[in-house]
Amino acid sequence: MRFNQYSYINFPKENVLSELKKCGFDLQNTANHKDSLETFLRRFFFTYQDTNYPLSILAADKKTDLLTFFQSEDELTADIFYTVAFQLLGFSYLVDFEDSDVFRKETGFPIIYGDLIENLYQLLNTRTKKGNTLIDQLVSDGLIPEDNDYHYFNGKSLATFSNQDVIREVVYVESRVDTDQKGLSDLVKVSIIRPRFDGKIPAIMTASPYHQGTNDKASDKALYKMEGELEVKLPHKIELEKPQLNLVQPQGKAELIAEAEEKLTHINSSYTLNDYFLPRGFANLYVSGVGTKDSTGFMTNGDYQQIEAYKNVIDWLNGRCRAFTDHTRQRQVKADWSNGKVATTGLSYLGTMSNGLATTGVDGLEVIIAEAGISSWYNYYRENGLVTSPGGYPGEDFDSLAELTYSRNLLAGDYIRGNEAHQADLEKVKAQLDRKTGDYNQFWHDRNYLLNAHKVKAEVVFTHGSQDWNVKPLHVYQMFHALPTHIHKHLFFHNGAHVYMNNWQSIDFRESINALLTKKLLGQETDFQLPTVIWQDNTAPQTWLSLDNFGGQENCETFSLGQEEQAIQNQYPDKDFERYGKTYQTFNTELYQGKANQITINLPVTKDLHLNGRAQLNLRIKSSTNKGLLSAQLLEFGQKKYLQPYPAILSARTIDNGRYHMLENLCELPFRPEAQRVVTKGYLNLQNRNDLLLVEDITADEWMDVQFELQPTIYKLKEGDTLRLVLYTTDFEITIRDNTDYHLTVDLAQSMLTLPC
């Protein structure tokens, strides 16, 4: 384990003493260090009647147990303090470590022995081996009462609200959209779990079209075959109009009553970060949105009608929209328990909705935590004039996603009444998708949140993985740079795939978000501020660094690609084409081994480099015909240890999100030997070589100069490493699978790779 502590806040000594005293640690500034440590530990072991016993089973050094040490005349030393501290954090002395000073350096332990009271205070705010901070572990065990009131420690809310005796209710928010054109505003179901409190509380809202269930069968039927010819497009410039949103006004009157009438029973799934905040005094709201089970309307996937309906839930929390008790719309309830302040959470589609919501500039949305979210839907299902698939999901497109999330069809009555209209709406979507050309058009323009990024007022926290080929890093990169300069923005850029990171051992992500939301949503005045970029170092396990920016580097490193011309044959023998199509993983393996139709260029790294931003290929290239698809991957090549893209469980159900509440696995990205690691990749239709909105002819056997930016990333390379650039045509995981007989030729002498460093 390595400690990477970003959540700790330096407080004045009087605040430290006061907070310790409120938790029963009655330490005196004038007492000697040894007496203070003993006083602290006897309170620490509050679950024991006889505190001599737990002291006797800890060690002060290799020859002395802690009780014997306190009974002796020996002085407290730094070595003894560290030895005790590590044991309190769950490490076994003489098993996990033998020399506390060596272990302190190996783990990056954040505490330097000196002022013992401040050391003990920070120790309570440090994560244990099993994932909780020490103070959270003690509170979970009953250190302070579960009194349904707020208690703070180091600028963070503690788990002092019951997670068993909570209010569970359902309301139906009246949206300002009518997606199915029935003349009534769509209703959106809101599932609420909130602690009991005599006052107003903030809300954590997860906008998830998946929450009410998914129609996997219908979605699978809507998948496309990726086999087909790359379209030869007519040259033209793409014209666009400013997206428009037509809102509807509330209709009719409804009796105001005091409480919701529908009780929330079981929910499909909760998000463990939300679970963590519930006993800390934050309401949990789950909203599936229009076109989902128990709501009304069509599934409009990603457009501002869908976003508006989610926004209207925040409006209701602030008294600007109505919520009914049921679908009759006869009775309404107010969110009189809400303080109007909201944060959004969730990954993938959920993080996408956070991005979209932020761009409305809605009042009350204080913070978004957008994890692996889409910033422009074109870049999810298309790339540079090509029809593409999200990584791992060949053949998926917008209509299959709509079928997946239109969970109203899971209710037989809704299916009978509404499926015909839903299918008609889906046909309109299919026509607008334009799978023929892969070009950007008005449909995608209406789902591009970057156009409204200037409206964002909320503080923004992103998480994204360098190995996320589902929602690719370009999404967070573009959103990060499109935000107004005056707002606070932060990015946790890890080396995983399309995954959550709130339960990783190496970083205090939950606690950092607690500090932020306690400040922004509960009004606690602290100077807590996350760094702009928190980056997971790819060269070592469990190592995180603060950076000033993502991209924007002034310097670059250029690699020449060679001296000759090389060709990429597009067509495969039928047997190989069929084999790769059945299992794209086989294609990826053979591509990395140099066995596919490809140009492979090994580039020695002659000095330490820190890539930060978008690698760019400048290529002199020609096609043997009037079309061309170019794929590129940049690898770090060579057998060595690399961080793996998916977290592994270190210990099962050891993270407590409250008081024995929703126990969670402790995880981390493994660091183990592999033959290579993908650094970045990209795909380009050569007819869109100069601009996404400009389609140009390709003249057979005529040289073209192409600038081709790959996916943004942050990656450290060391002198002696090897980069491998792979250029090829069809990518059997991502692109259309065109097996026509043509080839691309690259003049390597007139081509280069540029890395921003």
UniProtKB/Swiss-Prot annotation:
<keyword id="KW-0031">Aminopeptidase</keyword>
<dbReference type="InterPro" id="IPR029058">
    <property type="entry name" value="AB_hydrolase_fold"/>
</dbReference>
<keyword id="KW-0720">Serine protease</keyword>
<dbReference type="Pfam" id="PF09168">
    <property type="entry name" value="PepX_N"/>
</dbReference>
<dbReference type="GO" id="GO:0008236">
    <property type="term" value="F:serine-type peptidase activity"/>
</dbReference>
<dbReference type="GO" id="GO:0005737">
    <property type="term" value="C:cytoplasm"/>
</dbReference>
<dbReference type="InterPro" id="IPR000383">
    <property type="entry name" value="Xaa-Pro-like_dom"/>
</dbReference>
<dbReference type="InterPro" id="IPR015251">
    <property type="entry name" value="PepX_N_dom"/>
</dbReference>
<dbReference type="Pfam" id="PF08530">
    <property type="entry name" value="PepX_C"/>
</dbReference>
<feature type="active site" description="Charge relay system">
    <location>
        <position position="348"/>
    </location>
</feature>
<feature type="active site" description="Charge relay system">
    <location>
        <position position="468"/>
    </location>
</feature>
<dbReference type="InterPro" id="IPR008252">
    <property type="entry name" value="Pept_S15_Xpro"/>
</dbReference>
<keyword id="KW-0645">Protease</keyword>
<keyword id="KW-0963">Cytoplasm</keyword>
<dbReference type="InterPro" id="IPR013736">
    <property type="entry name" value="Xaa-Pro_dipept_C"/>
</dbReference>
<feature type="active site" description="Charge relay system">
    <location>
        <position position="498"/>
    </location>
</feature>
<dbReference type="Pfam" id="PF02129">
    <property type="entry name" value="Peptidase_S15"/>
</dbReference>
<dbReference type="GO" id="GO:0004177">
    <property type="term" value="F:aminopeptidase activity"/>
</dbReference>
<dbReference type="InterPro" id="IPR050585">
    <property type="entry name" value="Xaa-Pro_dipeptidyl-ppase/CocE"/>
</dbReference>
<dbReference type="InterPro" id="IPR036313">
    <property type="entry name" value="PepX_N_dom_sf"/>
</dbReference>
<comment type="function">
    <text>Removes N-terminal dipeptides sequentially from polypeptides having unsubstituted N-termini provided that the penultimate residue is proline.</text>
</comment>
<dbReference type="InterPro" id="IPR008979">
    <property type="entry name" value="Galactose-bd-like_sf"/>
</dbReference>
<dbReference type="GO" id="GO:0008239">
    <property type="term" value="F:dipeptidyl-peptidase activity"/>
</dbReference>
<comment type="similarity">
    <text>Belongs to the peptidase S15 family.</text>
</comment>
<protein>
    <recommendedName>
        <fullName>Xaa-Pro dipeptidyl-peptidase</fullName>
        <ecNumber>3.4.14.11</ecNumber>
    </recommendedName>
</protein>
<keyword id="KW-0378">Hydrolase</keyword>
<comment type="subunit">
    <text>Homodimer.</text>
</comment>
<dbReference type="GO" id="GO:0006508">
    <property type="term" value="P:proteolysis"/>
</dbReference>
